[in-house]
């Protein structure tokens, strides 16, 4: 679920998902179009693509199971669809963490009119 995604971003990247990524670049937040503006925006693009491949459940609403083992998030549970959602969220949170150094405030509330380039395929 999106609430769990927010929690994983805090656990893994150490920052607020809503504050930092709720409206960033062309892909972080609702919707997405054009080309990702930087590495953090690309994390959101890849996350959107990941959600797009999930079938049989609702990535934004369905609650999944995970545990923390030696500081790492381990996705679990019996439902392969929900496990896939968890993996999408975990990978995006790791991507955010790994790209904190290049995060740029100029992409906060980035105008959609600047996201008109042709999108690349997932």
UniProtKB/Swiss-Prot annotation:
Q: What cofactors does this protein use? A: Ca(2+)
The disulfides recorded in the entry are 26-115, 28-44, 43-95, 49-122, 50-88, 57-81, 75-86
Give the signal peptide as a residue range, or say none if absent: none
Query: GO biological process: what's one of them?
Result: lipid catabolic process
Residue numbers binding Ca(2+)? 27, 29, 31, 48
InterPro entries for the chain: PLipase_A2, PLipase_A2_Asp_AS, PLipase_A2_dom, PLipase_A2_dom_sf, PLipase_A2_His_AS
Q: Name one GO cellular component term.
A: extracellular region
Q: In which tissues is it expressed?
A: Expressed by the venom gland.
Q: How is the cofactor bound?
A: Binds 1 Ca(2+) ion.
UniProt record similarity statement: Belongs to the phospholipase A2 family. Group II subfamily. D49 sub-subfamily.
Write out the function statement from the record. PLA2 catalyzes the calcium-dependent hydrolysis of the 2-acyl groups in 3-sn-phosphoglycerides.
Name the record gives this protein:
Acidic phospholipase A2 A'
Native species? Gloydius halys
